[in-house]
């Protein structure tokens, strides 16, 4: 059985609120870490979210 191309990742807020989004990415085409500017409802503003591993 072949290894799956898509893996689940966690986007953790850089505002240190502990809030995170879970999404997936294609690990073969996107080898670098993802970084998005999304809404953090705990901080009540848009902040940068960086990719971390799901533990």
UniProtKB/Swiss-Prot annotation:
It comes from the Bacteria. GO terms for molecular function: structural constituent of ribosome. Keywords: Ribonucleoprotein, Ribosomal protein. One of its GO terms (cellular component) is cytosolic large ribosomal subunit. Pfam families: Ribosomal_L33 (PF00471). Transmembrane segments: none annotated. SUPFAM superfamilies: Zn-binding ribosomal proteins. InterPro entries: Ribosomal_bL33, Ribosomal_bL33_CS, Ribosomal_bL33_sf, Ribosomal_zn-bd. One of its GO terms (biological process) is translation. The keyword Ribosomal protein applies. Belongs to the bacterial ribosomal protein bL33 family. This is Large ribosomal subunit protein bL33.
